[in-house]
Amino acid sequence: MPGYPARATSDLKVCIDLIVRPGRHALAPDITEARLERVAGAASGRLGKDTITSPAALRRALRGAQQSVPYPLLVSVNQEGGRLNALDWPQVAQLPANLALGAGRDPEAAELAGSVVAGQLRAAGLTWNLAPVCDLATWPSVPAVGTRSYGSDPKAVAAMAAAYVRGLQGGKVAATAKHFPGLGGITVDPHHDAPVTERLPHGALLPFRAAVEAGVACVMAGSHTVRALDDRPAFASPRVLGLLRDDLGFTGVIVSENLSIPAVHQPLGGLSEAAVAAVAAGVDIVMLDSEISRGHQDFAQRAAGVRRRALVTRALWDAVREHRLSQDRIEEAAARVRALHHAYGLGADAVLPSWEEANAAAEHAARRIADRSVTVVRGRHVLPLSSTEPVLAVRVPDTGERRADSARRAPDHLPGSLARHRLVTSLSPCAAMPPGTGTVVVYGYDTGSAAAAETARWVGAGRVVVQVALGDPDDLAGSSADVLVAAFSPHRSSAESVADLLLGGRAPGPAAVPVGGTAWQ
């Protein structure tokens, strides 16, 4: 397996390790991946949720690992809220998506979101979050962005992103603004294709500037190419990263997009070449896989992760030896990563909050955010629904097309939430229509056009129909429902808020879908 030459300089090895495996180096600087797996359920840059099955188990594993390393432990996680949450065990309270916060138009709520997520993460032993998303939303939505964005208005998104950074880092968890210089305007999913756009949308840099001014610890450089700036992907472009350093004044850690994804590294000739290009351009941490995997990894997958890290490690070493990459650049990057460890890493004497208290605070905040953000797009005058008619709840299956979407596994909370107010009968799409009257609630998460088609069937039968989008509000496009509701999230807090709005007499708030130019507003 490729790796360091036998006579590699130890100082340079340490620097490269910090760039390629910042969390793993702290976890186990001198032991093998196999030993690491036995000690902490971790290998190949991941903490597997097939071996660590609860926040308490994660906390124990990280605490145990910290006892044997000489400096603070730093492990990253994607815990954005909404559809992307690595910590998605059933006992973890989930916050609504960023687009919900944008709909509520309350930066204080975004700061609260950052604060309670920080509490949850620190209670589990994690101190680095790959959030917030600073990309601008577009319509039709981009698969890689969607509800992960705060909206399409640059100033509003900037206010939300800065507030989230203050909340998260005020809770002693490092924030990461992503995906610089902004994914708004791309038309393909960067997990599958190499996105190319001619220019940045107006105001695309404003959210990143606001995050930098708020003191964000890290910025993730995207894998997309903006031709007006450079013909190379952002993470490998000295000009794009220079814009971040020189124009925005960012002095923290620049992280690459996940280079393990073929669509990310193939345009540059492969994984090794992409890693060298990224560090040469100014990246400080080469991201390879996430720190916490979403599912089971077999031996072959773990071994592939080890090989990827070894390839990148050797590629950086060879690039320095061959004078394609300066040792000064390596040492500069390593110094920033060390500073991040000491600013946010988990020390052996760190006092961690109670999981129960942190999670309860997140549950309370989630409901507060949901109540401000659930949006009645059409039919406010119809609400609340009749107090005498029964309710038929029809769930439309999701398309399953979105990658990296933990919300798809969320329990179906809406029928139970509705049943707190009224007798509810659940039906499958295309089921025979029961006789009599009754309001029909057609709902789903990431349904595409299928929910609108199911809605049309019930409208044609003369029923009062409510369509609820539990994910991307694009699902409401073309709907003939009497009432359209954008909830932005399928989690419990949003489902309960929708039920109270439809049946419990809670008046619709001032929220509005924060994406301009949509066909259904």
Q: Where do the model's predicted regions map?
A:
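Surface-exposed, active-site-proximal loop segments in enzymatic domains
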Residues: 89-102, 139-150, 189-195
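Substrate-binding cleft of extracellular glycoside hydrolase catalytic domains
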Residues: 74-87, 94-110
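Short glycine-enriched loops at secondary-structure junctions
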Residues: 24-26, 77-85, 89, 127-137, ...
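Hydrophobic faces of well-ordered beta-strands that scaffold small-molecule active sites
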Residues: 2, 14-24, 42-46, 73-81, ...
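Second-shell residues forming the walls of enzyme active-site clefts
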Residues: 6-10, 28-31, 38, 51-73, ...
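Catalytic domains of carbohydrate-active enzymes, especially glycoside hydrolases
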Residues: 34-47, 115-128
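A substrate-binding/cap region within the structured catalytic cores of diverse enzymes
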Residues: 102-126, 133-154, 161, 165, ...
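Preference for extracellular/luminal or secreted protein segments
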Residues: 1-38, 267-521
